[in-house]
Design a protein with these regions (language model features):
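C-terminal catalytic "cap/lid" subdomain
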Residues: 1-72, 76-104, 108-327
Length: 327
């Protein structure tokens, strides 16, 4: 099963846009041109019969600009105030843009309790189902104005995690994270010229997690570990997930057309199918690695690394799970 076949099946889609995707880096103001293009893409998906849920960051940043704050809020109270001001302004812009296409939207603000409390979760699911049945586009954010990092429930902490939890809650088919990165690499590409881009992940294992969040890795500190954790939530719930760069908002169209944009994390169902397709090549690779480790004169680490970089096998990761840019 190729990527296009997989994506053609998708009907209920959650799309998360990060702050850097919808704002200007220089000023922190909303990028109205890009946001308008994003809305147009969503409308086109709706016209194709897709159900769309948006998870949008940006409330704190928009509120900070509106309040005339030059720097990020340092206290929790200041952050919550910025979120309260910014969320209303952000929704006003979304509503205005969607209204040009006569498309209704609904603001849905969630807390961790909305997901973890059984009764709240049930009500949240019912709300999403009813909104989608009514052809409304839900626009979701964490309720930062009241969310706190406390023991009973805590908070989501970031919208990648929120989007993954929403995907699980609504039984989404696909989660797209539009961020400030192209996708996942085997290493930090700015520091390692041998870093390989991973187009498809069929299994999230310890080796993959190590790539995303090694303690000394700049790559990990850039939020990749958070995205991998989000992928674990989404794929375990049956949704495929894609990380793509939001600089080109039209990448969403390319993704839905089945083009190899970003990194695709396959759900367990699709992952098993891909595992079977890759099994012969992986078995061959592992045999070669095993033989190399038996040879004399080189340390195991050096031998394995040397073999991994062999272009013939397009391999990465000490257990040889990257084949043809598929982990």
């Amino acid at each position: 099963m190729d990527r296009k076949q997989i994506l053609d099946e998708k009907n209920r889609i959650v799309i998360k846009v990060g702050t850097t995707t919808i704002t200007y880096e220089e000023t922190g103001n909303i990028n109205l041109d890009k946001l308008e293009k994003f809305v147009r893409i969503l409308i086109n998906l709706r016209n194709k019969g897709k159900e769309v849920i948006v998870v949008s960051s940006g409330a704190v940043g928009v509120g900070r600009k509106a309040l005339g704050m030059e720097h990020k809020p340092e206290t929790e109270a200041a952050k919550q105030a910025c979120a309260a001001v910014g969320q209303g302004r952000l929704m006003m812009i979304y509503e205005k843009l969607f209204n040009e296409y006569s498309q209704l939207t609904a603001q849905v603000l969630l807390t961790k309790e909305s997901i973890t409390n059984k009764e709240c979760r049930k009500n949240a699911r019912q709300t999403f189902d009813e909104l989608l049945r009514m052809n409304v586009v839900p626009i979701v954010n964490e309720n930062d104005a009241i969310s706190v990092d406390e023991l009973a429930y805590g908070n989501f902490g970031d919208n990648d995690t929120l989007a993954a939890n929403v995907s699980e809650l609504v039984d989404a088919d696909l989660l797209i994270l539009m961020s400030d990165i192209e996708g996942m690499y085997t290493a930090y590409p700015k520091k390692n010229q041998n870093a390989r881009f991973i187009h498809t992940v069929v299994e999230i294992d310890e080796s993959l997690e190590a790539m995303a969040g090694g303690s000394a890795s700049d790559f990990g500190t850039g939020g990749m570990m958070t995205k991998v954790n989000a992928a674990k939530i989404a794929t375990s719930a049956g949704a495929d997930m894609i990380i793509a760069n939001g600089d080109n908002i039209y990448a969403i169209n390319d993704i839905m057309a089945g083009k190899k944009i970003g990194t695709l994390f396959l759900s367990k169902e699709h992952g098993k199918q891909m595992e079977n397709e890759l099994a012969p090549e992986r078995a061959k690779f592992r045999r070669q690695v095993k033989n190399l480790k038996k040879s004399e004169g080189k340390s195991e680490e050096h031998k394995t690394t040397e073999f991994i970089q062999n272009e013939e096998y397009l391999a990465g990761g000490n257990d040889g799970k990257l084949y043809g840019n598929t982990w």
